Amino acid sequence: MPVEPAEGEHPMLELRNLSVGADNEGVHRDILKNVNLRVDDGRLLVLTGPNGGGKSTLAKTIAGILRPDTGRILLDGEDITERGITERARMGIGFAFQQPVRFKGLTVRDVLTLAAGGQVSEDKLYDYLRDVGLCARDYVDREIGSSLSGGEIKRIEIATVIARGARLTIFDE
């Protein structure tokens, strides 16, 4: 049985009657309809379902990539429904895409430093890579490009999410 927050406390994330749809050839189709969800701080939530079930749409809507048709998104009790992806990222919402972006010309060190928001010690860079199962010595100065496998790129993307220090991280797998 879920524990409700005490009076005056809010769940970290709350969705209230969230609906998202898409227009296709003049026909509106509901993808998500009246979704209600509460996620308390420090919890892990995994959503599973069939292809086309709306998982990516939900993830992108929470992150601010998509806008809901109706409903509200609250972070720590504050309505963030109208805020964009950049502002939500500043508020601590991180997002990892299904297909990680390849940053041609940048090294792993570069993207981790950017994600962390400034200079990062060598030890911290190594920690981020070790946390995702990569040998830091072998990867920290490698260029992110076609020489890395999809799995390596995904691990590096997860390391950037860790470096970002996001409060709420959404992985669209």
Placement of each model-derived feature along the sequence:
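Helix-to-loop junction immediately C-terminal to a conserved catalytic motif
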Residues: 63
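Q-loop/switch helix immediately C-terminal to the Walker
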Residues: 99, 105-124
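The feature captures the beta-strand-to-loop junction immediately N-terminal to the Walker
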Residues: 48-50
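ABC ATPase C-loop
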Residues: 161-162
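Hydrophobic anchor residue at the start of the ABC signature
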Residues: 158
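ABC ATPase NBD coupling module
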Residues: 79-94
